[in-house]
């Protein structure tokens, strides 16, 4: 059965809007504190100094355990506020936003729903790991694969603040490449993964949920705090432990993942592909790819590998893929990872020709 506009509407009256408005208020306050205000101030730093800080990969200890602890400390100090906000919003979207509303906007498997997922991500400006809990919450409300993936990938890849930083620090030609390739990545990967998931028709369970939403109260008889606490714990337990463990593992692995950069790391296809693969799996805070690439370019890296890293480092990561292991099938996640590597490598080749 196909998803259609005949889905029943939500209950009328001002009370139907109170909980969604509360969700918007929490999201706006949280994003202002965690993202909008700090990034607004950082844009002036980027414009004035043509830098937003040092590379998070610099001066790595040679011992894997020391490298793991050092990287995890720096990483989590940079992202913990956004991670808390992501878990908070991922739980609240399940108890404050009516499921039938979400399905009307994001429920259909198609281009329109995918584009809306990408557009709704733009104010979030989160890294892939911090956006993952929100995506998990959306998927538990039966949001389509394409829309959920577009929301997830667009958060870091099409981050407006990152594009501005990139223009001031690396040059607007890099920012333009990131924008064009980013749109192709968000829309193309999401639509292809949607096809792989074979969910062009809405699951019957989702249709039943929408029908029930017209007649059953959103609170299912339980107190709001009880329902929210349950969703919050489920989301935390299924995403955060694996997140912490894999960040530690990648922190240790950076000793081998990122070799010493020098002029010999030119624009060869081997380096472009290798760094597209590494960039897809590695995890970084929001916008950290900019100082990483700036540092590597200063040491002699070619524009091809640099562009591959600019596309893949923020897009997804091994921790975020594992955080969403219960939200998407392994086939979908593998498709997303491989296509991200491919687009990263192609972006590197385009950069060699155009930049």
Q: Model-flagged regions — what are they?
A:
Residues 121-179, 257-332:
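Membrane-interfacial helix-loop connectors
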Residues 18-23, 27-41, 108, 113, ...:
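Juxtamembrane and boundary regions of transmembrane helices in multi-pass small-molecule transporters
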Residues 96-123, 209, 221, 225, ...:
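Membrane-interfacial helix-loop-helix
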Residues 90, 94, 185-193, 246, ...:
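Alpha-helical transmembrane segments of multipass membrane proteins
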Residues 1-25, 41-63, 198-231:
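Intrinsically disordered, low-complexity non-transmembrane regions of multi-pass membrane transporters
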Residues 78, 82, 86, 90, ...:
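Alpha-helical transmembrane segments in multi-pass membrane proteins
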Residues 59-61, 76, 103-109, 140-141, ...:
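Helix-boundary and loop/linker segments of multi-pass membrane transporters
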Residues 69, 86, 96-106, 225-303:
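Transmembrane helical segments that form the transport core of multi-pass membrane transport proteins
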């Amino acid at each position: 059965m196909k998803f259609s506009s005949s889905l029943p509407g939500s209950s009328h009256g001002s009370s139907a809007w109170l909980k969604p408005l509360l969700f918007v208020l929490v999201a706006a306050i949280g994003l202002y504190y965690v993202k909008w205000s700090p990034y607004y101030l950082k844009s002036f730093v980027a414009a004035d100094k043509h830098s937003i800080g040092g590379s998070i990969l610099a001066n790595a200890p040679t011992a894997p355990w020391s490298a793991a602890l050092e990287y995890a400390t720096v990483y989590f100090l940079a992202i913990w506020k956004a991670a808390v906000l992501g878990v908070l919003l991922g739980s609240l979207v399940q108890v404050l936003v009516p499921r039938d509303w979400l399905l009307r906007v994001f429920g259909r498997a198609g281009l329109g729903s995918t584009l809306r997922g990408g557009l709704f991500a733009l104010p979030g400006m989160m890294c892939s790991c911090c956006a993952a809990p929100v995506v998990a919450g959306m998927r538990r409300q039966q949001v389509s694969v394409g829309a959920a993936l577009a929301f997830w990938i667009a958060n870091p890849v099409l981050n407006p603040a990152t594009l501005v930083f990139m223009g001031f620090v690396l040059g607007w030609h890099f920012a333009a490449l990131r924008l064009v390739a980013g749109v192709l990545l968000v829309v193309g990967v999401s639509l292809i993964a949607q096809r792989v998931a074979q969910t062009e028709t809405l699951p019957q369970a989702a249709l039943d949920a929408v029908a029930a939403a017209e007649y059953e109260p959103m609170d299912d008889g339980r107190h709001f705090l009880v329902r929210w606490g349950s969703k919050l714990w489920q989301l935390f337990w299924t995403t955060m432990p694996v997140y912490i463990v894999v960040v530690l593992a990648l922190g240790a692995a950076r000793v081998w993942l990122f070799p010493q950069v020098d002029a010999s790391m030119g624009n060869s296809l081997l380096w472009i592909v290798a760094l597209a693969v590494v960039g897809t799996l590695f995890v970084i805070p929001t916008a950290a790819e900019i100082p990483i690439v700036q540092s590597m370019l200063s040491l002699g890296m070619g524009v091809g590998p640099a562009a591959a890293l600019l596309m893949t480092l923020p897009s997804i990561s091994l921790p975020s893929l594992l955080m969403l292991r219960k939200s998407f099938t392994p086939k979908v996640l593998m498709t997303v990872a491989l296509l991200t590597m491919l687009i990263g490598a192609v972006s590197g080749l385009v950069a060699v020709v155009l930049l």
